[in-house]
Amino acid sequence: WREKRMKKVMWIVAMIPVVVTSVVLQFMPDIIPMHHDLEGNTDRWGSKTESFIFPVIILFITLFWHLLIYVFEKKSKNANTEKEQMEAKSSAKVLCVVGISQAIMFGIMHYFILYSSWIQANAGGEHAVIDIAKVSCILCGIIFIVLGNFMTKAKRNAVVGVRTVWSMHNDNTWRKSNRFGAICIIITGLLTIITTVFTSGMTGTIFMLIYLLLATIVTVVYSKKIYDKEIKK
């Protein structure tokens, strides 16, 4: 039942941008800024109805998560052992959290985009009012922290968590690799937020990618180290 409630929440959150956009567009000019260059200058204006594109994309991404969750729920029902059932259930729960987090993050991004477009269109300006890249990076940082706290709850599987040849060796290598990976992704989130607050959105994005790359490399190396220790036992 918990997964069913979480899936309902995921779809409700995913639908909110569609509803908000439908209402907000009633008060918007027919032509609004649709795209900006790296410096925030508007390089394309378009019909306000184009604002529905992002909410529709959010719905399709949510559908993807819904189908993936369904696969694990089916695996749980058809599991031959209790261990397999628990692993599938755990993965389904984590995917629910991922789906909800993604819908919230993209939704907030869309609200900022709508607000910025509304202000700029009414003012007749040629420059973005809000640095959307900055907002996106901060939201990504928050999502990293949230996901990091849930990574350790995922049982061994082929979809969710730190999945290397070495981490998949057994439950012990999986648990230790994911615990370390969770710490790395949380630190990545914190560093991304701190960096972005004091820099531009573009700079924050570059540093976020660097942090992610370093976190990935360190986690993979640690996973191999844990595996080597495990096979020597």
Residue ranges, per PLM feature:
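Ordered, amphipathic secondary-structure segments that act as subunit-interaction surfaces
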Residues: 68-122
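Active-site and channel-lining beta-strand-loop segments
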Residues: 23-53, 160-169
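Small-residue-rich transmembrane alpha-helices that serve as helix-helix interface/gating elements
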Residues: 139, 205-219
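Short, Lys/Arg-enriched N-terminal segments with co-localized hydrophobic residues
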Residues: 1-5
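Cytosolic, membrane-interface loops and tails of multi-pass inner-membrane proteins
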Residues: 40, 75-88, 156-172, 233
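Alpha-helical transmembrane segments
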Residues: 13, 44-64, 129-147, 210
